[in-house]
């Protein structure tokens, strides 16, 4: 069969998802039922040039993407003719700038965790404060977002500003870099992004889904550098002629947390998912109108399918969840293995009065208090290591409840009736912890539901790509494929639930105002 022949539709059995993450790049092959056929994965180097700086090598990442695509095809023993389409999901906010004529990055990827842009953010905020652009872009000024990272590169890499103004440089988040290279690079590569990734740059109008030239000018970013913004599900381009995926449509792009929401079939207003990893990321679907948060949450795009209206979400991020369990293991030695925490915590009936607020680098949503630091409170001689383990488990559930209550308040204030939570879909490594999941249901007061396919992020990108080419007919197929693995119903007495949460809130208050601005940590 020649490379340009059209294969019969029944020959197209799979969709390929490329998951370009913070620590590794993965390729996952899915079948029509949403089941995993094969996976390949390759880690990349974490580069720390200075305290607070985190970088990746963009060329290394592209090499790894090519490697895992080849690896997954070999493992599944298939060729590109059996692949209907390709979806991309990615670590959000990480930014790269490259020369469109040579394909070479002018600097390393500046990763979402990197904090070097704080002075740029302070300068942009001026007297208006960190919410200067929030009405327009849905985000407060913060070092997470991609726009100021590009500003830093243009201001600090020799010759970059001049090359950008001459029209020689392009910028993008990691979806854009991957897409541009997959579709040909310097030989006609497609320079585009989707609405979810664009919504994390601080450069996109959240209402109109286009670039804001005033904010670009404030940040000193020529509009010529920016990718075209497109729907999440739609054909972006086709695999390059000299690659493994020649002529295969690349037809879905979603930022990682939005992809997880899509993979969890959160298509109705008021549906929410929480991903339990190093931290927690919760997204609640708020429908086709953006809801502005008055309660410390971000307004973001959830997804857009073709010409349909974009669907929005409120997002709350929790800095420390699974990493607290690692800290208990590595720093205190209370457990030997992360999975041991559940049995230790279950060996006592309650927390013994102990509460652990893991504000190791401040508190994220909904508090946004960088001055907070971690605290273990309520200690008596009665408390033992099992009570501390239980307090660690419970802290993730309390923090999740704080974010959910903020979401419900925002939804109610916006008049967005029907957007109050009815069940919480969960994914990520910590969802294997039965004690935590039951306590989570007890605290949020609604059922907590775990799906059978744990790889919800890659699955979401695959669905977006497959829908665009008719491999799946639409979101109803995603809903039909989604299968429940386990459900935890709230079982705690209301008075006890509220007593515990009241004490948690008291514990949070004890962590605030800890860092003085004039004290160097």
Regions found by a protein language model. Give the residues of each.
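Active-site core segments that coordinate phosphate-bearing ligands/cofactors
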Residues: 2-10, 16-18, 118, 125-140, ...
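N-terminal glycine/serine-rich phosphate-binding loop of ATP-dependent small-molecule kinases
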Residues: 1-107, 135, 228, 233, ...
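Short linear loop/turn motifs
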Residues: 226-235, 342-346
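A structural motif corresponding to the C-terminal end of an alpha-helix
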Residues: 218-225
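Carbohydrate-associated surface elements
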Residues: 114
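Short secondary-structure junction motifs
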Residues: 24, 80-83, 224, 351, ...
């Amino acid at each position: 069969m020649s490379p340009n022949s059209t294969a019969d539709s029944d020959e197209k059995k799979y969709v390929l998802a490329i998951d370009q993450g913070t620590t590794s790049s993965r390729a996952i092959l899915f079948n029509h039922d949403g089941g995993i056929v094969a996976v390949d994965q390759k880690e990349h180097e974490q580069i720390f040039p200075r305290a607070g700086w985190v970088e990746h090598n963009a060329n290394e990442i592209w090499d790894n993407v090519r490697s895992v695509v080849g690896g997954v095809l070999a493992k599944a023993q298939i060729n590109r003719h059996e692949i209907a389409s390709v979806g991309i999901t990615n670590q959000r906010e990480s930014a790269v700038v490259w020369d469109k004529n040579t394909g070479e990055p002018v600097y390393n990827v500046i990763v979402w965790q990197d904090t070097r842009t704080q002075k740029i953010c302070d300068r942009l905020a001026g007297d208006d404060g960190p919410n200067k652009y929030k009405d327009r872009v849905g985000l407060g000024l913060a070092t997470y977002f991609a726009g100021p990272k590009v500003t830093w590169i243009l201001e600090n890499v020799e010759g970059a500003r001049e090359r950008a103004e001459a029209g020689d440089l392009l910028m993008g988040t990691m979806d854009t870099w991957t897409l541009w290279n997959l579709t040909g690079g310097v030989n006609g590569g497609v320079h585009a992004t989707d609405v979810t990734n664009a919504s994390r740059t601080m450069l996109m109008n959240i209402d109109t889904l286009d670039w804001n030239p005033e904010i670009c000018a404030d940040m000193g970013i020529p509009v010529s550098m920016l990718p075209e913004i497109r729907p999440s599900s739609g054909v972006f381009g086709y695999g390059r002629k000299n690659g493994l995926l020649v002529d295969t449509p690349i037809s879905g792009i979603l930022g990682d947390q939005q992809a997880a929401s899509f993979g969890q079939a959160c298509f109705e207003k008021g549906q929410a998912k929480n991903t339990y990893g190093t931290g927690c990321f919760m997204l609640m679907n708020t429908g086709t109108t953006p809801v502005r948060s008055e309660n410390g949450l971000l307004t973001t795009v959830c997804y857009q399918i073709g010409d349909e209206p974009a669907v929005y979400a409120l997002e709350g991020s929790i800095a420390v969840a699974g990493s607290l369990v690692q800290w208990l293991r590595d720093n205190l030695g209370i457990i030997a293995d992360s999975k041991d925490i559940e049995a230790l915590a279950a060996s006592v009936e309650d927390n013994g009065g102990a509460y652990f607020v893991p504000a190791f680098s401040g508190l994220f949503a909904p508090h946004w208090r960088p001055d907070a630091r971690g605290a273990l409170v309520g200690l008596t001689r009665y408390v033992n290591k099992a009570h501390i383990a239980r307090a660690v488990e419970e802290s993730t559930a309390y923090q999740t409840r704080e974010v959910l209550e903020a979401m419900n308040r925002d939804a109610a204030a916006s008049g967005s009736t029907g957007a109050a939570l009815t069940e919480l879909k969960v994914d990520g490594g910590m969802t294997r912890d039965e004690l935590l999941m039951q306590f989570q249901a007890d605290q949020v007061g609604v059922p907590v539901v775990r799906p059978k396919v744990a790889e919800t992020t890659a699955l979401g990108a695959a669905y977006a790509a497959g829908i665009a080419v008719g491999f799946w007919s639409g979101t109803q197929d995603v809903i039909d494929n989604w299968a429940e693995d386990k459900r935890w119903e709230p079982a705690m007495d209301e008075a006890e639930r509220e007593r515990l949460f009241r004490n948690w809130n008291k514990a949070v208050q004890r962590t605030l105002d800890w860092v003085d601005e004039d004290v160097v940590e």
